[in-house]
Structures are given as C-alpha cells and as structure tokens.
Amino acid sequence: MTKKNWNINLKEMVKVGVHFGHETRKWNPKMAPYIFKERKDNHILNLTYTARFLSEACDFVFDGAKRGKQFMIVGTKHQTADAAKLAALAARCHYVNKKWLAGMLTNWFTTEARLEKFKNLTKKKNTGGFDGFTKKEAAILKRELNKLQEDLGGIRYMTKLPDIVIILDQKGEYTAIRECRTLGIPTICLVDTDCDPDLVDIPIPANDDGRGPIRLILNKLILAIRAGRELYYKK
C-alpha cells in the first residue's frame, strides 16, 4: 500500500477536540490501547494512534481511488448527516445520511429495483409524465418519488455494491457495519471510547460526537480520495 504524507497535525486535532472521549463509565475495554488518560471522569484518546490510523486510512482510500474503486460514506445522526453529504459530493462518493435501510447492501437485488424505479419516476416527472394522471394519482406518485429521494437520494447513481465504506458513527450504524462484514466490504470507521475497534477494518480513534473532529477526519479522507481519483483519470 502506498504511504504518503497527509499532513496530519496533532495540534490541529487537539484544537477541534478529536481527543475527547466519553465518560469513563461508558467505555468499551477494547478501546484501552487507544486511551491516553482519564480527566474528570472522561477518557482522553491518544492522538498518536488517531494520526497513525487516519494516515493508514488515507493511504487505503488513495490506493482504492487510484484503481477506480467506489466509496460510500455513512453518517445518519444529526452531527454527521451534513458532513457526510458534503464530503460525498466533494469527492463524488455515494452516501447515506438519513436512515440506513436494512438490507440496503445485503439485499442488493431489491435495492437495485428501487433505484431503477427512482430513476424512472424522476425521468417521468421531469418530462411532464405526471401530467396525464389525475390529481390524486399524480399526488401518490409524487409522494412515492419523495420517499425514494429520502431513502435513496445519496446512492441514486450506484450501479453496484461499494468497494469501501466510510462510517462516521459505529454505535448508530451497526446494521451498515454488519452488512459490510457479511459481504466482505472493507470499512473505515471513527471509534470513540465506547466503541469496538474489532468490528471494522480500519478503526480511527476519535471523538465521534463533535462536528469539528468529524469534519477534520473526513476532509483528510476526501483529500486522499480526490488525489487517487486524479491519478485514475490520468491513465
């Protein structure tokens, strides 16, 4: 795997609070190697490990993007939803930021069928295809289209399973992680002090509740994806 300098700065991580963990009573003992100390009944993460795993994750997505791999970013809680969407759009990734639908990946045949319906209804609406229906029928179709937009808007251009999935909140995205593990899709995930680092392929010890830490880590990953994509398109 390519090893590059991604300009990961410990002072920058401290400034946005990447090191702040949860209350000590909520911890997962599997996170012990990544905890620096306790402070006022809260755990403080060791940012040396954060920098190490973030660098590894950047190298991994860079190599993937360089080979034309497809990425998905998952962040459905309110602290992560906007960041997930903005990052995905910046790097042309798929994203889920509303709700993870059970079976989205493991039942890909059904997801694919819904995506096709979404595509057809969108085309019909944009070309005046709803005009031939009664008001009631058109209203039903519009509601169906809005529901598909809410559920699948971030993956509307997906034609196959993603190659790499970036997850911003392990505790809230267990279903997504389980589906990725079932299918053998590599995962990169922020892991706070209450998480299980063994559930994902590349855990990044970090505060997963603050918008600042989430944005900082995502920005590094997106930078790496875009750098890899540039090389891919130059081939």
From Swiss-Prot:
Residues folding into a coiled coil are none
Give a GO cellular-component term: mitochondrial small ribosomal subunit
- Top-level taxonomic group: Eukaryota
Q: Identify the InterPro entries for this entry.
A: Ribosomal_uS2, Ribosomal_uS2_bac/mit/plastid, Ribosomal_uS2_CS, Ribosomal_uS2_flav_dom_sf
Q: Any one Gene Ontology biological process term?
A: translation
Q: Which UniProt keywords apply?
A: Chloroplast, Plastid, Ribonucleoprotein, Ribosomal protein
Q: Supply the Gene3D superfamilies for this chain.
A: Glucose-6-phosphate isomerase like protein, domain 1, Helix hairpin bin
| Molecular function in Gene Ontology | structural constituent of ribosome
Q: Is Plastid found in the keyword set? A: yes
The protein's location, in the record's own words, is: Plastid, Chloroplast
Q: Which family does it belong to?
A: Belongs to the universal ribosomal protein uS2 family.
Entry-linked HAMAP family: Ribosomal_uS2_B (MF_00291_B)
Q: State the protein's name.
A: Small ribosomal subunit protein uS2c
